[in-house]
Amino acid sequence: MAQEVLKDLHKVRNIGIMAHIDAGKTTTTERILYYTGINRKVGETHDGGATTDWMEQEKERGITITSAAVTCFWNNNQINIIDTPGHVDFTVEVERSLRVLDGAVAVFDGKEGVEPQSEQVWRQAAKYDVPRVCFVNKMDKLGADFYFTVQTIIDRLGAKPLVMQLPIGAEDDFDGVVDLINMQAITWRGKTEIGTDGTIEEIPADLQEKAEEYREKLLETVAESDEELMEKYFGGEELTIEEIKGAIRKLTVNSEIYPVFCGTAYRNKGVQPLLDAIVDYLPNPLDIGEVNGTSLDGEETLTRKPSVQEPFSALAFKIAVHPFFGKLTYVRVYSGQAIPGENMLNSTKNKKERVGKLFQMHANKENPVEHADAGNIYAFIGLKETTTGDTLCNPDNPIILESMDFPDPVIQVAIEPKTKADQEKLGTAIQKLAEEDPTFTVQLDEESGQTVIGGMGELHLDVLVDRMKREFKVEANIGNPQVAYRETIRKKVESLDYTHKKQTGGSGQFAKVIVTIEPYNPDPEELEEGESATYKFENAVTGGRVPKEYIPSVDAGIQDAMQYGFVAGFPLVNIKATLEDGAYHDVDSSEMAFKLAGSQVLKEAVAKAKPVLLEPIMAVEVVTPEEYMGTVNGDISSRRGQVFAMEDRSGAKVVKAKVPLSEMFGYIGDLRSSTAGRANFTMVFDSYAEVPSSVAQEIIEERTGSKA
C-alpha cells in the first residue's frame, strides 16, 4: 500500500540528484530508495537493475537518460526525487527537472572532483536558483581525496562549500565520517550490508585536531550569518545544535553556502546522514514561496502562493509514453488543487484540457491519488495538447508561468523508412518522441525529400533511433551524422525598400516595406524573459503608414525566410530586423501580401549583408596520462582545435580546447587507439563560430552538389 502524499508542505522536499556521468548518482538514488523503504531489492546500475533507469536503453548502457520521478518517505518527511542524466547529450532533461525543483543534491566523484558536466549542471542549477547540498561519493575508490574535491568546488565552480563531515580513512579503508555538528564519528566498518545503520563512536584521536579546526570554520560561518548568533559565539557562549542547523538551513536555502557530505553509496556508507541533510537543509515549497507568472496577454504580472486555497496552477515539465496508459504528463503543482475528470486550461496554448487519472510516481510504477495538491509532483493522464514547458491552470483564473529555454540541436541525421508500413509508423514515432523531447527536431529536406532528425549529440540520436525500433517497431536506414550549420550576416544593410505588387484582375496584392537588417549579438544577461538570443524584430513605423494589424505579418515573413539561408540553405541566426516605413493599399493589401514582402526584403537584404557560414564549436576536455600530452595536443590541432588551458588533475593532465563539432566525429576511437585506451574526453556545446573560407567552400559544394 502506497503511503499517502503529505499535505503539510513543511515536510515535503522536491529535489533533484545531479552529477557528471559515472559520479554515482543513480546508485545514490537507489540507496536512498532502499533506505526509505520503497525498494525491497536494491538495484545496481551495472547489472541493469536500477529502479530509476527504466528504459531498455538505460539498462543496457548503464546511464540515466530520462528523469524518472520517485516519491519516498524519510522520518515522516516526503521526498520527491528526480534522477537526472549526467551525459551532456541529455542536458535538456536536467534543465527541465531543475525548473520544477526546490533543491538538489550535487554528487561528485571523490577522485575526480568537479568534472566538466558537473560544471554545466551546476550552472543550470544556478540559473534557476536551486539550493544545493553536495555529496562527495566513491570515497572507497583508489585515489579518492575528499579535500581535493572540496577545493575543486571552490576553484572550478566559484562556490562556497561548507564542510559538514570529514572522512574517516579513504579508499579501501574508508570507514565512516566525523559529524562536525554533533562532534561524533559515524562508522560502517568492513563490508557493510545494505540497510546497515552507522555506529556512533568517539572521533578517532588522529582526526580530533582536524575536526576541531573544521568545526571552528563551520561555527564562524554560522555566526557571521546572524547578529544574535555572532554576539553569542564571540561572547564565548555555546551555540545549540538547533541554532547551528537553523542558520545552515537559512544560508543553504539562500544559496549562500553549499553543505558538503561524503560517503560511498555503492558500499552503503554515508547514505542515511545524506537523507537527514536533505530534510534538514534543503527548502520545502513554502520556503520557495510564491511563483510569478503573467496574464494571458502578457501585460500583467501575477503571483501564486503554494497553497490549496489558491487557484490551480502547474507546470508540465516532462512527457513520457506509458505502455498501458499512453501519454503521461509530469507536472509540478504550484498552487491550488486538481481532481480527476476536472477541466483545466493550457494557458500557454490557450487550449482546454481535461485530466483523467492522477498518479504519484515511483519510477515507472504508479500510485493513483484522488487529488493533486500545491507543492507536489504528479503524473497526469488524459492531457492531449500539453507539451513540456506548458502551464496548466484554472480556466477562471488564468496565468502563464515562466517556461523553459531549450537549445537548438547541433547534430542531424537523415532517416529513411525501409517499407511503406515503416513510413506510417515512423510518422507516429517521430510525433510521440518530439512531444517528449523538445530538443529532438524533425524537418523535411525539400530538395532531397529526406526526413532529417536533429538532437544534442550522437548518443542522443542513437537512443532516439533505438527507441523507434524497440517501442514503435520502425525499421529505417540512418544516414551519417551531419552538423547543424547556421548562417548569419556580417554587415548592416540600411533602409532596403521592397514592394510586393500583383494585379490579376479583381483585387490584387500590395505591400511596401522599408527594412534595415544588421548583425544581432545580445548579451544573454540583458535579455528580457522570453526574448530570443538569435533574432529581434523592431517596429519603427510611425503615422500608421503600415497598419498595426500587418506588422506581425512582416515579422512572420522575415522569420519564414530565415529558415533557408543564402550561402548554403542553412537557417539564418543572429539577425535584427527593423521595419522603418512602408505603404499599403485600402483594397489590395492583406496579411499575406505583407508576409511575402517581409520574406522577400529579408532575402534581398541578406544577399547584400556579407552572409557567412557558422559551425558549432564544442568545449572539449581531455584527461590523459602525461606521456600522451603531445599526441593529444597534436591531434586537437589537426582537427582545427585550439588548446586554451592545461592543468593537473589526480595525477593526470587535463587539456581544455575548443574544437569544431564536424571534426569530432569518431574522436573517441582515435583517442583510445593513440593513448592505449588510457585517455578519455567530454565535450559540451560552446558557441557558433564562422567557418574558415576554405572549409566553407567544401561544405557549400557538398551541400549544393548533393542536391543538384
From Swiss-Prot:
Signal peptide: none annotated. Catalyzes the GTP-dependent ribosomal translocation step during translation elongation. During this step, the ribosome changes from the pre-translocational (PRE) to the post-translocational (POST) state as the newly formed A-site-bound peptidyl-tRNA and P-site-bound deacylated tRNA move to the P and E sites, respectively. Catalyzes the coordinated movement of the two tRNA molecules, the mRNA and conformational changes in the ribosome. One of its GO terms (cellular component) is cytoplasm. GTP binds at residues 19-26, 83-87, 137-140. Residues 10-286 form the tr-type G domain. It comes from Corynebacterium aurimucosum (strain ATCC 700975 / DSM 44827 / CIP 107346 / CN-1). Keywords: Cytoplasm, Elongation factor, GTP-binding, Nucleotide-binding, Protein biosynthesis. Belongs to the TRAFAC class translation factor GTPase superfamily. Classic translation factor GTPase family. EF-G/EF-2 subfamily. GO terms for molecular function: GTP binding; GTPase activity; translation elongation factor activity. It is found in: Cytoplasm. This is Elongation factor G. Its main location: cytoplasm. It holds the Pfam family EFG_C. Gene3D superfamilies: 3.30.230.10, 3.30.70.240, Elongation Factor G (Translational Gtpase), domain 3 (3.30.70.870), P-loop containing nucleotide triphosphate hydrolases (3.40.50.300), Translation factors (2.40.30.10). InterPro entries: EFG_II, EFG_III, EFG_III/V, EFG_IV, EFG_V, EFG_V-like, EFTu-like_2, G_TR_CS.
